[in-house]
């Protein structure tokens, strides 16, 4: 007889503990994301912002009707010429960890070019010059400074 997996009492307590602060964490992450995108939208190295509640998104009006928030996950398409520049940008970030699990308290980054080899860049459903971010609970000015200093590393 298999009754399926169950949580241990300690794991259940940890989950309940985390769920109690989830609305506050999402509110902070979303607010920081909106502020950061306002600061980055006019940066000369940012080609496009991919975030459903950003006015430049093709389905912005629909997102406004259906969503009360979009969280801290967004993508930037950068004005660069080579995948190596994307690597240089991501490596220059000092306060973002390379993403392995979205949704925690720390800010994360993931270069989309890491998903496929260079021979398949043209057939990838996502542009190779796209970088995905998750904004955690750090101070937004601190994160903006980090992104801006990494953008200065680009040609």
Identify the meaning behind each predicted range:
Residues 25, 107-155:
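PLP-dependent enzyme catalytic core of the Aspartate aminotransferase-like
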């Amino acid at each position: 007889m298999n009754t399926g997996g169950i949580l241990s009492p300690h794991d259940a307590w940890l989950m309940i503990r985390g769920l109690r602060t989830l609305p506050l964490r999402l509110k902070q992450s979303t607010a920081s994301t909106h502020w950061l995108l306002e600061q980055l939208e006019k940066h000369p190295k940012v080609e496009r912002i991919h975030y459903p509640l950003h006015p430049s998104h093709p389905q912005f009006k629909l997102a406004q009707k259906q969503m009360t928030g979009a969280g801290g996950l967004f993508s930037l398409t950068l004005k660069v010429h080579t995948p190596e520049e994307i690597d240089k940008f991501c490596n220059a970030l000092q306060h973002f960890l390379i993403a392995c699990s979205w949704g925690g308290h720390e800010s994360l980054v993931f270069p989309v070019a890491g998903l496929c080899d260079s021979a398949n860049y043209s057939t990838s459903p996502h542009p190779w010059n796209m970088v995905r971010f998750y904004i955690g609970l750090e101070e937004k000015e601190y994160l903006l400074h980090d992104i801006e200093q990494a953008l200065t590393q680009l040609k």
